[in-house]
């Protein structure tokens, strides 16, 4: 068996996630494509595919149980993180992957073609210039340095009165929370357990007040 698959299976076994055979094969295929393209396009600073399984795949998958709704957008998706792993886990949900760099969007189009992922739309745009036809149930990002920037730049993206922001962070960002704009409030903070990942991971769920 492919060493990446062996490692992925071992990591998943340390979580409570249910991942099908097809999903596991797609996740391994994604890592293989990321490794191949990374050599020419410098898509991630993580060079070792085994390390990608922990820092990129599992780090994204642990968000999976917390997705409520049908339509999601991954802002500043880069090479598709966390969007591609989450789309693989939720074939019944729609994902828009937004990034401003053409090389990343080209990579994402290759991924969804090669792995036959039918629920992802890659879009090349700056977030402030992206004007969706309708709002999203969840606005995901692990790219923003600050949650204040995230909610300010993305405030036009969630569904009115229903959509939420989902910020993936390291240590619990209490300092950042105090700096959030008046209209935004923290709905929940989830401590995430990522097998073999050093350091803390948290998912901060934010929504518009009122």
Swiss-Prot record:
Transferase as UniProt keyword: yes
Pfam families per record: GidB
Main location: cytoplasm
Keywords, sorted A to Z: Cytoplasm, Methyltransferase, rRNA processing, S-adenosyl-L-methionine, Transferase
Protein location: Cytoplasm
Top-level taxon: Bacteria
Top-level enzyme category: transferase
Catalytic activity, EC: 2.1.1.170
Any one Gene Ontology cellular component term annotated for this protein: cytosol
MF terms (GO), sorted A to Z: rRNA (guanine-N7-)-methyltransferase activity
UniProt-listed InterPro entries: rRNA_ssu_MeTfrase_G, SAM-dependent_MTases_sf
Binding locations of S-adenosyl-L-methionine: 76, 81, 127-128, 142
Catalytic activity: guanosine(527) in 16S rRNA + S-adenosyl-L-methionine = N(7)-methylguanosine(527) in 16S rRNA + S-adenosyl-L-homocysteine
Physiological role: Specifically methylates the N7 position of guanine in position 527 of 16S rRNA.
PANTHER family: S-ADENOSYL-L-METHIONINE-DEPENDENT METHYLTRANSFERASES SUPERFAMILY PROTEIN (PTHR31760:SF0)
Family: Belongs to the methyltransferase superfamily. RNA methyltransferase RsmG family.
Protein name, as recorded: Ribosomal RNA small subunit methyltransferase G
UniProt lineage: Bacteria, Pseudomonadati, Pseudomonadota, Gammaproteobacteria, Vibrionales
């Amino acid at each position: 068996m492919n060493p990446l698959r062996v490692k992925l299976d071992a990591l998943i076994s340390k979580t409570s996630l249910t991942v099908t055979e097809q999903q596991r094969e797609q996740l391994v295929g994604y890592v293989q494509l990321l490794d191949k393209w990374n050599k020419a396009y410098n898509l991630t600073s993580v060079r070792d595919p085994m390390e990608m399984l922990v820092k990129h795949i599992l780090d994204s998958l642990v968000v999976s149980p917390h997705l409520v709704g049908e339509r999601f957008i991954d802002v500043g998706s880069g090479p598709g993180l966390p969007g591609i792993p989450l789309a693989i886990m939720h074939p019944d949900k729609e994902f828009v992957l937004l990034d401003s760099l053409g090389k990343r969007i080209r990579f994402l189009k290759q991924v969804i073609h090669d792995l036959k992922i039918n629920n992802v739309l890659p879009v090349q745009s700056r977030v402030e210039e992206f004007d969706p036809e309708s709002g999203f149930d969840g606005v995901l990002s692990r790219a923003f340095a600050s949650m204040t920037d995230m909610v300010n730049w993305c405030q036009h993206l969630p569904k009115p009165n229903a959509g939420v922001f989902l910020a993936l962070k390291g240590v619990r960002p209490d300092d950042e929370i105090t700096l959030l704009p008046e209209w935004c409030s923290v709905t929940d903070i989830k401590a995430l357990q990522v097998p073999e990942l050093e350091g803390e991971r948290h998912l901060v769920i934010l929504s518009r007040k009122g």
